Amino acid sequence: MGFPRGDVLSILDYSRENLEYLFLVADQMEKYLSEKKKLHLLDGYIVALAFLEPSTRTMYSFQSATYRLGGKTLVFTSETATSLAKGENFADTIRMLDSYSDLIVIRSKYEGTARYAAELAENPVINGGDGRHEHPTQAMIDLYTMYKIFGGIDGLTIGILGDLKYARTITSFLYGLTRFKPRKVYLISPGILRLREEVRNKIAELGLSFEETTSLQDVIDELDVLYVTRIQKERYPDPIEYERVKNLYRISIDTLRNVKKEFRILHPLPKIDEIDYRVDETPYAAYFYQAKLGVPLRMALLSLVLGVWRG
């Protein structure tokens, strides 16, 4: 058991044993945080946060994780804030960031950006989200949340609701689930937002049992977990298509009337109108706890990727 050093580009690069080891280290980080223990694992390290697409939770949780470990950050929050706006090519920007830091976390609206950056950089690169492709560290948090709430992932019945076509969080979440043995996975969306064929084929190839449906109410009473995503407005090339689908699903108090007692809702956030604000106050809402776990999980990830963890 252990966790490989180096780039974090796809959750498919990790085994179940790798992920479970990451969760154990995250548990230890969570304990340190609760004890207000000052850590020095990243003393002398600089983490570059190259966020060329808007972010709140991912960027700030990586920044907080770095600070909590004793490191420092360089933050680039948009293309306009760097020499990219002056015409500098992307490769030169990555080489510059690589020379200034010990690790790069990168987010971009373009698929494949993180992998290309990793080919250029000598230091590790972490994919903070690349277009509709993947968001591996969010999936690690999602899996860790279920691990914390249920004591494991095997045997759970999981529903995934919303924009299955464009949401990179769903792609990585499904890829992560292939490393475990959930009882069943329901993919819940209208045909226009159906999971992309290449993702569907990949999870089938990896042995994940799933069923597609358009009706949440037909399956919600079976679920242990409902993973909800917003409609990805920024990924829609056609605004008319977005207008057609933006309000197709909404979780209300009434939606939850027959759910299991232990049922929980996850959401990678931000949520817009897809969950009624009154649901936030119910015991079913686990998404704020999920967001809170982002810091200890990313603390664990940084310490393992950089090889400074000595647990």
Curated annotation (Swiss-Prot):
<dbReference type="GO" id="GO:0016597">
    <property type="term" value="F:amino acid binding"/>
</dbReference>
<dbReference type="InterPro" id="IPR006131">
    <property type="entry name" value="Asp_carbamoyltransf_Asp/Orn-bd"/>
</dbReference>
<dbReference type="GO" id="GO:0006207">
    <property type="term" value="P:'de novo' pyrimidine nucleobase biosynthetic process"/>
</dbReference>
<dbReference type="GO" id="GO:0006520">
    <property type="term" value="P:amino acid metabolic process"/>
</dbReference>
<feature type="binding site">
    <location>
        <position position="168"/>
    </location>
    <ligand>
        <name>L-aspartate</name>
    </ligand>
</feature>
<keyword id="KW-0665">Pyrimidine biosynthesis</keyword>
<dbReference type="InterPro" id="IPR002082">
    <property type="entry name" value="Asp_carbamoyltransf"/>
</dbReference>
<dbReference type="Pfam" id="PF00185">
    <property type="entry name" value="OTCace"/>
</dbReference>
<dbReference type="InterPro" id="IPR036901">
    <property type="entry name" value="Asp/Orn_carbamoylTrfase_sf"/>
</dbReference>
<comment type="similarity">
    <text>Belongs to the aspartate/ornithine carbamoyltransferase superfamily. ATCase family.</text>
</comment>
<feature type="binding site">
    <location>
        <position position="269"/>
    </location>
    <ligand>
        <name>carbamoyl phosphate</name>
    </ligand>
</feature>
<feature type="binding site">
    <location>
        <position position="58"/>
    </location>
    <ligand>
        <name>carbamoyl phosphate</name>
    </ligand>
</feature>
<feature type="binding site">
    <location>
        <position position="86"/>
    </location>
    <ligand>
        <name>L-aspartate</name>
    </ligand>
</feature>
<feature type="binding site">
    <location>
        <position position="138"/>
    </location>
    <ligand>
        <name>carbamoyl phosphate</name>
    </ligand>
</feature>
<feature type="binding site">
    <location>
        <position position="270"/>
    </location>
    <ligand>
        <name>carbamoyl phosphate</name>
    </ligand>
</feature>
<dbReference type="GO" id="GO:0044205">
    <property type="term" value="P:'de novo' UMP biosynthetic process"/>
</dbReference>
<protein>
    <recommendedName>
        <fullName>Aspartate carbamoyltransferase catalytic subunit</fullName>
        <ecNumber>2.1.3.2</ecNumber>
    </recommendedName>
</protein>
<feature type="binding site">
    <location>
        <position position="57"/>
    </location>
    <ligand>
        <name>carbamoyl phosphate</name>
    </ligand>
</feature>
<dbReference type="InterPro" id="IPR006130">
    <property type="entry name" value="Asp/Orn_carbamoylTrfase"/>
</dbReference>
<comment type="pathway">
    <text>Pyrimidine metabolism; UMP biosynthesis via de novo pathway; (S)-dihydroorotate from bicarbonate: step 2/3.</text>
</comment>
<dbReference type="InterPro" id="IPR006132">
    <property type="entry name" value="Asp/Orn_carbamoyltranf_P-bd"/>
</dbReference>
<feature type="binding site">
    <location>
        <position position="230"/>
    </location>
    <ligand>
        <name>L-aspartate</name>
    </ligand>
</feature>
<feature type="binding site">
    <location>
        <position position="107"/>
    </location>
    <ligand>
        <name>carbamoyl phosphate</name>
    </ligand>
</feature>
<dbReference type="Pfam" id="PF02729">
    <property type="entry name" value="OTCace_N"/>
</dbReference>
<comment type="function">
    <text>Catalyzes the condensation of carbamoyl phosphate and aspartate to form carbamoyl aspartate and inorganic phosphate, the committed step in the de novo pyrimidine nucleotide biosynthesis pathway.</text>
</comment>
<comment type="subunit">
    <text>Heterooligomer of catalytic and regulatory chains.</text>
</comment>
<dbReference type="GO" id="GO:0004070">
    <property type="term" value="F:aspartate carbamoyltransferase activity"/>
</dbReference>
<feature type="binding site">
    <location>
        <position position="135"/>
    </location>
    <ligand>
        <name>carbamoyl phosphate</name>
    </ligand>
</feature>
<keyword id="KW-0808">Transferase</keyword>
